[in-house]
Amino acid sequence: MARVTVEDCVERVPNRFELVLLAAQRARGLSRGEELTVDRDNDKNPVVALREIADQTIVLEQIRSDLVRSLARAPEPEPADEEVMDLIPTEQNIFGLQDVSAEEEASHGTAGMSAEELEAAIEAELGGRARR
């Protein structure tokens, strides 16, 4: 069989969607090192899997049970790596900028300033002239 088409396999697995699932499961098994039942002929694993299904050289019930087992298994949660931990909110300022809080404002003496005095202090801090 030079080329495998879905029509070659439909007689064995009438549902095309199930055929795709079974062939993909078998191809994953071949990638894990399971034994071939047909000659590879320089074909890739999905094509070999379809050829095995078409030639009826594999037991489909075994592939179905492997498929169900792989889908029923809950994946293990991945441990949070350092990059993900950096995205989790913390008490620290993540941007490395100075936090300005009410306590710090009070310690700088800006709490009792009027708007004009505050503007003048900002201009002086920035090296500019206060507008009047």
Curated annotation (Swiss-Prot):
Catalytic activity from the UniProt record: RNA(n) + a ribonucleoside 5'-triphosphate = RNA(n+1) + diphosphate
EC number(s) per entry: 2.7.7.6
Classification via SMART domains: RNA_pol_Rpb6
Keyword Nucleotidyltransferase found: yes
Domain of life (superkingdom): Bacteria
Gene3D superfamilies documented for this protein: 3.90.940.10
GO molecular function, a single term: DNA-directed RNA polymerase activity
Alphabetized UniProt keyword annotations: DNA-directed RNA polymerase, Nucleotidyltransferase, Transcription, Transferase
One Pfam family hit: RNA_pol_Rpb6
Residues forming coiled coils: none
Matching InterPro entries: DNA-dir_RNA_pol_omega, Pol_omega/Rpo6/RPB6, RPB6/omega-like_sf
GO biological process, one term: DNA-templated transcription
NCBIfam families with a match to the protein in the record: rpoZ
Functional description taken from the UniProt entry: Promotes RNA polymerase assembly. Latches the N- and C-terminal regions of the beta' subunit thereby facilitating its interaction with the beta and alpha subunits.
Subunit structure: The RNAP catalytic core consists of 2 alpha, 1 beta, 1 beta' and 1 omega subunit. When a sigma factor is associated with the core the holoenzyme is formed, which can initiate transcription.
Name of this chain's protein: DNA-directed RNA polymerase subunit omega
Record organism: Gluconacetobacter diazotrophicus (strain ATCC 49037 / DSM 5601 / CCUG 37298 / CIP 103539 / LMG 7603 / PAl5)
Encoding gene per record: rpoZ
